[in-house]
């Protein structure tokens, strides 16, 4: 089962969290969902050069909070914050509510599966040998602290007539262990022979349940 199902979907509520957090009645659900997809598509195109890994959307009462995880926060913010202000205004216009944008820096992009997959895809588009690209990504991830990594490339590799897939793994990648913190990423490389798919699994360790912090008598917890 762990080999076939999406590594993030099966771990939601265990060691992974949702990328969109909001509540809506049945009549508004589809509208808000399509709005989220439109915002994500716009941000992905607008920030395609900023190495964006993930976009989280929260909708508190009558406003929205968007967290952008990027390896290049300076490109997103822009000179004196001009770019992020323009971005906030455009997203607010799309969503129809006030929007607050947070920038979360990714300090180790070698451990982010989405960025690793995008990097391998870019190398394939530059006609670098796929085995060399996979080996380099695996070596960099293990060097900065990954406990295991697996990379799979599918398509017409090296322009072959018959499509196939090749994969490379180092360390442990326990897909069946639900408490395993496994980051999954996917990217596409557009080559002259067609599209190549790149999948990356990175195992960062096991997450054990932590006790909830106790609230002192007479005080309240604020989330």
UniProtKB/Swiss-Prot annotation:
The answer to whether UniProt assigns keyword Aminoacyl-tRNA synthetase to this entry is no
PROSITE patterns in the cross-refs: KH_TYPE_2, RIBOSOMAL_S3
Q: Which GO terms describe its biological process?
A: translation
Subunit-structure text = Part of the 30S ribosomal subunit. Forms a tight complex with proteins S10 and S14.
The family this protein is said to belong to: Belongs to the universal ribosomal protein uS3 family.
- PANTHER family tied to this protein: 30S/40S RIBOSOMAL PROTEIN S3, SMALL RIBOSOMAL SUBUNIT PROTEIN US3C
Q: This protein is called what?
A: Small ribosomal subunit protein uS3
Source species of the chain: Nitrosococcus oceani (strain ATCC 19707 / BCRC 17464 / JCM 30415 / NCIMB 11848 / C-107)
């Amino acid at each position: 089962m762990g080999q076939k199902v999406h590594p993030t979907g099966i771990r939601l509520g265990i060691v992974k969290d949702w990328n969109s957090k909001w509540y809506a009645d049945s009549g508004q659900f589809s509208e808000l969902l399509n709005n989220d997809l439109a915002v994500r598509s716009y941000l992905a195109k607008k920030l395609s050069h900023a190495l964006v890994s993930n976009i989280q959307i929260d909708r508190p009462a009558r406003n929205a909070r968007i967290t952008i995880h990027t390896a290049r926060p300076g490109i997103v913010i822009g000179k004196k914050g001009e770019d992020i202000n323009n971005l906030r205004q455009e997203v607010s216009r799309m969503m129809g509510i006030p929007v607050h944008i947070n920038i979360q820096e990714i300090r180790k992009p070698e451990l982010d599966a989405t960025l690793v997959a995008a990097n391998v895809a870019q190398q394939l588009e530059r006609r670098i040998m796929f085995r060399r690209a996979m080996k380099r990504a695996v070596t960099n991830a293990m060097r900065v602290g990954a406990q295991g990594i697996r990379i799979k490339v599918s398509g017409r590799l090296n322009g072959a007539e018959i499509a196939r897939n090749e994969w490379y793994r180092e360390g442990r990648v326990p897909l069946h262990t639900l408490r395993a913190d496994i980051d999954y990423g996917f990217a596409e490389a557009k080559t002259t022979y067609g599209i190549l798919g790149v999948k990356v699994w990175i195992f960062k360790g096991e997450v054990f349940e932590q006790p909830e912090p106790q609230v002192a008598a007479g005080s309240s917890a604020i989330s």
